Swiss-Prot record:
It is found in: Cell membrane. This is ATP synthase subunit beta. PROSITE patterns: ATPASE_ALPHA_BETA. CDD domains: ATP-synt_F1_beta_C, ATP-synt_F1_beta_N, F1-ATPase_beta_CD. It is an enzyme of class 7 (translocase). HAMAP family: ATP_synth_beta_bact. NCBIfam families: atpD. The gene is atpD. Its main location: membrane.
Length: 467
């Protein structure tokens, strides 16, 4: 087959204009290969200008590129390796391994631009996705094939929570995880890789990175690379896959960096006019089908803590559950530092989770909310000024707060406590016993950093016998 060859006519930062023969214009989203100075640069067609020119976004650095260089149309979108051969490996946006471990034995190569599953293929059934983490399963449960937003500032434990989820999926569910680093720090990616190697989770995980130092084209597309690898496990192997995207805001940011160079007029706050469309194209592909599911956990950076900013606001519309990590809770030494009153879930509904789960979760939230209201009074007047009923609420709330903490498997090396996976029924039973007053005789310190309620009993009985 004869190659379709064009020539570079203009370069503006990461945006390249290439002239082809007018009857051979490459299609939108086609990958174009440019070879110069012994390097290979891949660009993606974004627009057709006039009769014979295409405007492309470079997925690598355009340093040293000049006009007149030959460009070859590959005839299709970027294709990335998929299948079991990708497990335990690290890839870049083009699906090339970057871990110096040799070639990848791929089952197939799939294009990164694919259409979302049709209505017929999607599964409307809503099922709870057990994570084994008490605070999440009880108060903001994840839906199988749902999308979860993980909100949190620096250093409150987003990455540790993500690693624990990856570990629990691999060990308890035997499932695969895809981790996509979008525009985040390379150091964090390195830490994650080293930690995963130590904990042995790496064998069930694929890592895809397009970090802060990459050009905007790469950061814009790397989420699609990770998603395509996840789709293979869902559609061909029938797996329930976990897809982590850290950070979805950087995906939007990269789109906005390129947008102006493509000649688009910016919209609100300088974002790209195609913002909702770009986010939708990514999010609509993350769903459950009749074959399997992709459950995604997306870390979301909130610019200047403003939730009404167009980037987080657009993402919110797609989420089924939000897990908010709070610095105040982390300061109390309660990990995971999930805010039990701020985190929400669409499936916390008696028709989906059942009456008992719904009742226990809402009662726990009521007790914690009342405790929050009483804290000012306690700070000024002390506990003695409270009514007997309020005193009881405070005692129970403090036990609940401590019981929401849990030792993680991935943090064993730091805490010295063995990790715990708590089944949903044990979680519900434990909190039910606290709110019904069956645990009123046990001091609150016994509830801190344990798994099930049985462990609280055991430790208490043991200490009583010792005395």
């Amino acid at each position: 087959m004869e190659q379709n060859v064009g020539y570079v006519v203009q370069i503006i930062g990461p945006v390249i204009d290439i002239r082809f023969e007018s009857e051979n214009l490459p299609a939108i989203n086609n990958a174009i290969e440019i070879h110069f100075d012994g390097k290979k640069l891949v660009a993606e067609v974004a627009q057709h200008l006039g009769n014979d020119t295409v405007r492309c976004v470079a997925l690598g650095s355009t340093d040293g590129l000049r006009r007149g260089v030959k460009a070859i149309d590959t005839g299709g979108p970027i294709k990335v390796p998929v299948g079991r051969g990708t497990l335990g490996r690290i890839f870049n946006v083009l699906g090339e391994p970057i871990d110096n471990k040799g070639e990848v034995v791929a089952s197939d190569y799939w294009p990164i631009h694919r259409s979302a599953p049709s209505f017929e293929e999607q599964v409307p059934a809503v099922e709870i996705f057990e994570t084994g983490i008490k605070v999440i399963d009880l108060l903001a449960p994840y839906a199988k094939g749902g999308k979860i937003g993980l909100f949190g500032g620096a250093g409150v434990g987003k990455t540790v929570l993500i690693m624990e989820l990856i570990r629990n999926i691999a060990t308890e569910h035997g499932g695969f995880s895809i981790f996509t680093g979008v525009g985040e720090r390379t150091r964090e990616g390195n830490d994650l890789w080293l930690d995963m190697n130590e904990s042995g989770v790496i064998e069930k995980t694929v890592l895809v990175f397009g970090q802060m130092n990459e050009p905007p084209g790469a950061r814009m597309r790397v989420a699609l690379t990770g998603l395509t690898m996840a789709e293979y496990f869902r559609d061909v192997e029938g797996q329930d896959v976990l897809l982590f995207i850290d950070n979805i805001f950087r995906f939007i940011q990269a789109g906005s960096e390129v947008s102006a160079l493509l000649g688009r007029i910016p919209s609100a706050v300088g974002y790209q006019p195609t913002l909702a469309n770009e986010v939708g194209a990514l999010q609509e592909r993350i769903t459950s089908t009749k074959k399997g599911s992709i459950t995604s956990v997306q870390a979301i950076y909130v610019p200047a803590d403003d939730l009404t900013d167009p980037a987080p606001a657009t993402t919110f519309a797609h989420l089924d559950a939000t897990t908010v990590l709070s610095r105040q809770i982390a300061e109390l030494g309660i990990y995971p530092a999930v805010d039990p009153l701020d985190s929400t879930s669409r499936i916390l509904d008696p028709r989906i989770v059942g009456e008992e789960h719904y009742y226990v979760a809402r009662t726990v939230q009521q007790i914690l909310q009342r405790y929050k209201e009483l804290q000012d009074i306690i700070a000024i007047l002390g506990m003695d000024e409270l009514s007997e009923e309020d005193k009881l609420i405070v005692y129970r709330a403090r036990k609940i707060q401590r019981f929401l903490s849990q030792p993680f498997f991935v943090a064993e090396a730091f805490t010295g406590r063995p990790g715990r996976y708590v089944k949903l029924k044990d979680t519900i039973r434990g909190f039910k016993e606290i709110i019904e007053g069956k645990m009123d005789h046990i001091p609150e310190q016994y509830f801190y950093m344990v798994g099930t309620i049985d462990e609280v009993y055991e430790n208490y009985e043991k200490d009583m016998k010792g005395k």
